């Protein structure tokens, strides 16, 4: 099976066309692709006047244009790849509610028969089981100081709202709890298969401090919002053949036990600025 992996496209700033010149079977979108709330607030055009305005590039507010850009992007991906697997990053939930954002993305992806949005979900393609989720961090294994400090340090906890707790923003304790539930979900799924079954984990936050760029290695607290140390989990589950992530805007490709861990982020592009991430638009992974 041939897989193309991309993450951190940030289509809210600029468009991109992901091609399939190598005949890949699966495209993985490992998070931070678009903002879910934009899709909810700006549904697809329903009349010819709106469609004409979009075609001409007129009459669009920024967020409406972003929503249409994302829908067009999904259409192109659906056309060019036999299968598309998409997990949300943290940016997907900006300016909206967490669980509502998941629902919005499920709804958009469900419009295409070969695009699968995963959040504590699986998709079987040929003989490979794909397990996907944002996989938030454990905040340095629920370290109290990290939980307290991240609330003031990261945008996630200022502009993502919690759905069921009144009008409050997401907290580090919320994501640490979500991390625990996702890992338990992955374990439960794998326990239901024979040991020779091949798995691919599609996530956004990183599963190892090996995905930390050296220039940030000293920042223990902030790294708690980017990385979790899942080395033992990975070593205990050698049936995971590939683990993809995004979030950090630096590419990584390394092995833990029998699991290949890969990150291939584009990063920000806007108004002539192109972030130097070192991403590979022609990457092909094999499982």
Question: Where are these predicted regions, by residue range?
Answer:
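Beta-strand-turn-beta hairpins that frame and shape the catalytic cleft
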Residues: 1-4, 122-132, 155, 198, ...
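Active-site neighborhood of phospho(di)ester-bond hydrolases with catalytic His/Asp-centered motifs
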Residues: 5-7, 27-32, 85-90, 116-120, ...
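Active-site environment of divalent metal-dependent phosphoester hydrolases
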Residues: 10-16, 34-38, 91-101, 122-124, ...
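Short amphipathic alpha-helices and their capping/turn segments at secondary-structure boundaries
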Residues: 14-22, 72-76, 117-126, 131, ...
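Active-site-proximal loop/helix segment associated with metal-binding centers of metalloenzymes
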Residues: 131-200, 205-220
